């Protein structure tokens, strides 16, 4: 008995397994065990053939049971499912959204050309009143339009031609839907058309509209409608509004009346904004009152005198003094005027000029270039020089020390030179006149007496030769009077042209005008170029060497033989200086009075100043002529 029960249990388990296996997808024809022995409960082992029932067909996408299973479907999820199932995944870039204002049609598919955006809009007001089946069919309808747009197969004139019908029939057969060309729920469309107009002309008796115009928006018929011109030709009547939603006009009037009511006539029930809200937060104006000055629009902006808030008097600011360890800077006292000037200066911060300002920028090949101010640097330099001169002259200690040091160095050098031969003493008047004239034409008259003594010799301070470095050496002890070839060449025409030197000598009023100009040219030649072997005058290489008389110390015994071979130049200087020694003061006055014309001549002969601009990319100052090449290399 136990064996029979085990055998029967095994048969039942096998039968259950065979029933579950075909349901997984195996066909009955391929499975030889489709016929199983069924055990008779009476004990007989007769084989009873039977067939396995086929699996039921899955629910259609428009089945009625979906109304309860998924009453609020996700439109985007449905779109992705239908795209993979019916459209081969070609609509992945299409957008699907609800439209809350579209009430004329159920759905719209818009396409912006090749490579543009394809968008599907579904009417939320219409489809929320329809069953789920209409939503699915409307979505599939618009997806067919999107497929024709994306695949560039939209050759149908009205959009619902053979290509559209081909895909429509294919999906209807595969899914059991009933996709049509036009939707059939017109009643829902009419529900939202609550603004009616009717024409009083002949068209009120014509089909199909009988003169009615129904719209969901309060937009009366006008020339903006495409059919307006045809209506004016065929009918010529005017439209009058005959219907609108309830309380539509009253709500608008109440809002307008509420806006026209003044603030004093507002109902007492309306609470001010400073009241405590329901959330528990309180307006800060209840804690900290407003202490400013308010203005009422349309009324008197004056505040009563009793309500004006009097600010406490301000204490006068204490004068601030500069620290005692800064003797160069003058002691400044900040009074009320200075404080006002400082406060106004902080408010008047220069704004950054726009590149569109044609007064500040110019267009150079499409790039903005700032227009530089040519007089800006000169004015700043003069103001700084004047400031330092005023500071040094005002400070007695620094001024006395600077003048004393310059005088002591000048006296020592003069004593050394007096102990030498007459070659150094006699031409000093001529060279002093020339050097004084050159220094005057460069930077104007001298301010210190030490400069006239230093200018007697060819190698004085750098101040006499290069006036641009005046700021660096002003107030410091003068350098030792050691003449170098560079200084001599600068004093005799390195930075000055020969014609300017000759013109300076010509203005002195000497009777030997032509001879003086020729002599200056010859001296310029001797001092610039190397000396020839037959020349008796020492070469620039020897000038400034220990063997020359101009730099020989007072304890030197004797000059070298090379210096004794220059009798001709010595005689020339002795003759010319002797003639002009009596009228030195008069010549200096004439040179100073007539000095400005050579300055103008020199400025006229000099080339114009080169305009520099800023690179808008790397902010480097460079000449204007090279800005284009620089921008090409900078923008790469």
UniProtKB/Swiss-Prot annotation:
Keywords, ordered alphabetically: Autocatalytic cleavage, Chromosome, DNA damage, DNA repair, Hydrolase, Isopeptide bond, Metal-binding, Metalloprotease, Nucleus, Protease, Zinc, Zinc-finger
Subcellular locations according to the entry: Nucleus; Chromosome
GO cellular component terms, A-Z: chromatin; nucleus
Keyword DNA damage: yes
UniProt xrefs under InterPro entries: Rad18_UBZ4, Spartan, SprT-like_domain, SPRTN_ZBD
Domain of life: Eukaryota
Domain called SprT-like: residue spans: 76-183
Residue span of region Disordered: 19-42, 238-382, 398-430, 473-608
Main location: nucleus
Residues reported in the UniProt entry to bind Zn(2+) 1: 141, 145, 160
Motif Nuclear localization signal positions after renumbering to this chain: 535-566
Protein name: DNA-dependent metalloprotease SPRTN
């Amino acid at each position: 008995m136990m064996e029979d029960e085990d055998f029967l249990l095994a048969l039942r388990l096998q039968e259950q397994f065979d029933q579950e296996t075909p349901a997984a997808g195996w066909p009955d024809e391929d499975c030889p065990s489709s016929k199983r022995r069924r055990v008779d409960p009476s004990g007989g082992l007769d084989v009873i053939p039977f067939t396995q029932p086929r699996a039921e067909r899955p629910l259609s996408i428009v089945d009625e049971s979906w109304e309860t299973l998924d009453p609020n479907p996700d439109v985007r999820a449905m779109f992705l499912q239908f795209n993979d199932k019916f459209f081969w995944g070609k609509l992945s870039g299409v957008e699907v959204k609800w439209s809350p204002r579209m009430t004329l049609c159920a759905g719209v598919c818009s396409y912006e050309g090749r490579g543009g955006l394809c968008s599907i809009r579904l009417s939320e007001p219409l489809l929320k009143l329809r069953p789920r089946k209409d939503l699915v069919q409307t979505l599939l309808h618009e997806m067919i339009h999107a497929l024709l747009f994306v695949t560039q197969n939209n050759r149908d004139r009205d959009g619902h031609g053979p290509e559209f019908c081909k895909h429509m029939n294919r999906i209807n057969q595969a899914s059991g839907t009933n996709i049509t060309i036009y939707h059939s729920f017109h009643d829902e469309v009419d529900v939202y058309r609550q603004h009616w107009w009717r024409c009083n002309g002949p068209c009120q008796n014509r089909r199909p509209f009988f003169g009615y115009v129904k719209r969901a928006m309060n937009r009366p018929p006008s020339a903006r409608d495409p059919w307006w011109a045809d209506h004016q030709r065929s009918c010529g009547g005017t439209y009058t509004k005959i219907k609108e939603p309830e309380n539509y006009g009253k709500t608008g009037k109440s809002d307008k009346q509420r806006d026209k009511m003044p603030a004093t006539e507002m109902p007492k029930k309306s609470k001010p904004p400073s009241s405590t809200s329901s959330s528990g937060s309180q307006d800060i104006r209840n804690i900290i009152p407003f202490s400013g000055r308010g203005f009422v629009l349309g009324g008197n902006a004056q505040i009563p005198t009793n309500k004006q808030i009097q600010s406490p008097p301000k204490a006068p600011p204490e004068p601030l003094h500069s620290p005692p360890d800064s003797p160069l800077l003058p002691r400044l006292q900040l009074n009320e005027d200075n404080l006002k000037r400082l406060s106004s200066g902080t408010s008047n911060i220069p704004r950054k000029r726009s590149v569109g300002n044609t007064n500040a920028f110019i267009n150079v090949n499409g790039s903005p270039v700032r227009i530089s101010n040519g007089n800006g640097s000169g004015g700043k330099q003069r103001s700084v020089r004047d400031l330092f001169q005023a500071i040094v002259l005002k400070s007695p200690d620094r001024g006395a020390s600077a003048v004393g040091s310059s005088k002591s160095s000048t006296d020592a050098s003069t004593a050394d030179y007096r102990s030498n031969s007459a070659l150094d003493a006699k031409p000093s008047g001529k060279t002093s006149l020339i050097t004084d004239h050159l220094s005057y034409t460069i930077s104007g008259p001298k301010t210190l007496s030490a400069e006239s003594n230093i200018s007697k010799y060819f190698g004085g301070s750098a101040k006499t030769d290069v006036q641009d470095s005046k700021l660096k050496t002003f107030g410091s002890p003068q350098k030792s009077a050691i003449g170098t070839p560079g200084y001599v060449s600068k004093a005799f025409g390195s930075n000055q042209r020969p014609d300017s030197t000759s013109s300076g000598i010509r203005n002195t009023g000497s009777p030997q005008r032509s001879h003086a100009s020729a002599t200056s040219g010859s001296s310029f030649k001797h001092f610039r170029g190397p000396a020839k072997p037959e020349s008796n005058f020492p070469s620039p290489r020897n000038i400034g060497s220990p063997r020359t008389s101009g730099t020989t110390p007072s304890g030197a015994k004797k000059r070298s033989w090379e210096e004794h071979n220059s009798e001709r130049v010595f005689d020339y200087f002795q003759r010319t200086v002797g003639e002009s020694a009596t009228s030195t003061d008069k010549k200096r006055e004439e040179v100073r009075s007539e000095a400005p014309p050579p300055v103008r001549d020199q400025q006229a002969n000099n080339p114009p100043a080169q305009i520099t601009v800023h690179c808008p990319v790397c902010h480097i100052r460079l000449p204007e002529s090279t800005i284009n090449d620089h921008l090409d290399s900078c923008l790469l």
